[in-house]
Amino acid sequence: MTELRQRAVREDAPPEDKESESEAKLDGETASDSESRAETAPPPTSIDDTPEVLNRALSNLSSRWKNWWVRGILTMAMIAFFFIIIYLGPMVLMMIVMCVQIKCFHEIITIGYNVYHSYDLPWFRTLSWYFLLCVNYFFYGETVTDYFFTLVQREEPLRILSKYHRFISFTLYLTGFCMFVLSLVKKHYRLQFYMFGWTHVTLLIVVTQSHLVIHNLFEGMIWFIVPISCVICNDIMAYMFGFFFGRTPLIKLSPKKTWEGFIGGFFATVVFGLLLSYVMSGYRCFVCPVEYNNDTNSFTVDCEPSDLFRLQEYNIPGVIQSLVGWKTMRMYPFQIHSALSTFASLIGPFGGFFASGFKRAFKIKDFANTIPGHGGIMDRFDCQYLMATFVNVYIASFIRGPNPSKLIQQFLTLRPDQQLHIFNTLKSHLTDKGILMSALEEE
């Protein structure tokens, strides 16, 4: 009798309630079914994406050594490409960073699309790329305003875009937000919000951190090259130590990682970071901030190096003196800051472990098959993004000070009466300190 009464109540329920119940049920089935399918799916099979030339040349080797040579050859090719783009200068580097960012975004969004494409979500891919455009417009607009200030103030259209940049950015994002709301359809509400969150988390991880990479680049190419090179060195040396000496598994998320590779990569990266920092600190083109020259309409990297990049003498602790026989040693202060290579080798790999967990959750081996033996672009940059964020925070906390050129640029945009007020205030301050009179006497 109780069951009959409950059935009668359900049958007497309004149509709207019935629809909402069925919709909630379908949403629940959608989420749970997709999760169960992901959990019960077979392990990913390895796809041989090795070029045919290498396949023929390495056909007599075992799969282990074949993978060693494929990874090694492609790694050398990528390092050569890295040297070429460094030679081409900061503008090319900035464009490469943007291209890498777009490719990484594409790889992550494609995974989501492949998982849920059977549900035919409306506008999912279109809105994902639209939000990427909006966020890039915001961040790159901020960068252009900050580092191309004189150029922006000189051109009327750019000045207007700069003045209302944040309002325009917000309007663009709001348009995408409204488009998403209008695209919501019954039976897919929960799934559509899943993908909305997926897109925004991807934007946070990829676009925001690539923007920080560009900021590091403008602080001086050394802040761009050394951190990236340390991560590359750690990847290579950890793989080599693990390949030859690896016996003890490091973490379940990535079974091929070993403690031997982790420790060997750590020491090799620290030594490499110190040596690379010493070499690069002697060149102005690497240590000077990248600035826009209004007269030549180009970037310049010429300056008087700061104390951070001038050789100084340091006393060696007594314990070490007895071992090496030296009382003092000359080194660049930047080499002390190159201890950030410690971060690259101790914390940086956790970016890779995070990516491994993500791939295991979706039963995929790599983000893509862009680079034979390595996977996708995101497989190569999972540690780089974490490193870029750390370097940017490190510079802001311990290195960066007021930038005189930027202050002068802002000063020149003020009204004449405001400029005169600042001039008189500065003159009074320098006179009270005795700095102005001393400068006049020296002249």
Curated annotation (Swiss-Prot):
Biased composition (Basic and acidic residues): 1-38
Single GO molecular function: phosphatidate cytidylyltransferase activity
Positions bearing Phosphothreonine: T30, T50
Bilayer-crossing regions: 78-98, 129-149, 165-185, 212-232, 261-281, 338-358
Modified residues (Phosphoserine): S20, S32, S34, S36
Keyword Oxidoreductase included in the entry's annotation: no
Subunit structure: Homodimer.
Purpose: Catalyzes the conversion of phosphatidic acid (PA) to CDP-diacylglycerol (CDP-DAG), an essential intermediate in the synthesis of phosphatidylglycerol, cardiolipin and phosphatidylinositol. Exhibits specificity for the nature of the acyl chains at the sn-1 and sn-2 positions in the substrate, PA and the preferred acyl chain composition is 1-stearoyl-2-arachidonoyl-sn-phosphatidic acid. Plays an important role in regulating the growth and maturation of lipid droplets which are storage organelles at the center of lipid and energy homeostasis.
Protein name per Swiss-Prot or TrEMBL: Phosphatidate cytidylyltransferase 2
Gene that specifies this protein: Cds2
